Amino acid sequence: MKENEQYKDAEKRTMGTIEVREAEGEEMILEGYAAVFNSETDLGHFREVIKPGAFDDVMTNDVRALINHDPNLVLGRTKNGTLELSQDERGLKYRVKLGGQQYAKDFYESVKRGDISQSSFAFTIDKQSWNEERTVRSVDKVRQLLD
């Protein structure tokens, strides 16, 4: 499947905060929550809640951390261990070990200065439910976690 085809039905969400974690030596590490469970997000024409367990089926997928969903600006990848994903009671957590590319260094510095304070993720939905009365969509299962 071509890269653009993967994103054809993808939805993107901006969530939570992104933080700098300086580890031993010169490593550049960013971490935060891509999604927070049971928290309503106002998407304009409806609100959305991501349910615990929504990501259970995609945790072993090859997921990339990208700058602005651009496949040319890869910050990390689960396949090679530079992106780690985990779930806890709060949500879907990520930890990215950045490489030495100039764009990664620039991105890291922008987060460190506070110019960039949020992150987003792209996904497709497998199962959802609606509360029509309150116009709230619950994301019960994610089909693909793209970035």
Q: Residues of each region from the PLM?
A:
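Residue microenvironments linked to proteolytic maturation
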Residues: R21-E24, I29-E31, R64, T82-D147
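Flexible, active-site-adjacent loop/turn segments at secondary-structure boundaries
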Residues: A35, G53, L73, R137-D140
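A glycine-rich, hydrophobic loop/mini-helix early in the fold
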Residues: P52-V96
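Short, surface-exposed beta-strand/loop "edge" segments at domain boundaries and coil↔beta transitions
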Residues: F37-L43, P71-L75, Q102-K105
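Short, flexible beta-strand-to-coil junctions
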Residues: A35-S39, N68-D70, T124-D126
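Polar/acidic, low-complexity leader/linker segments enriched in S/T/G and N/D
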Residues: M1-M59
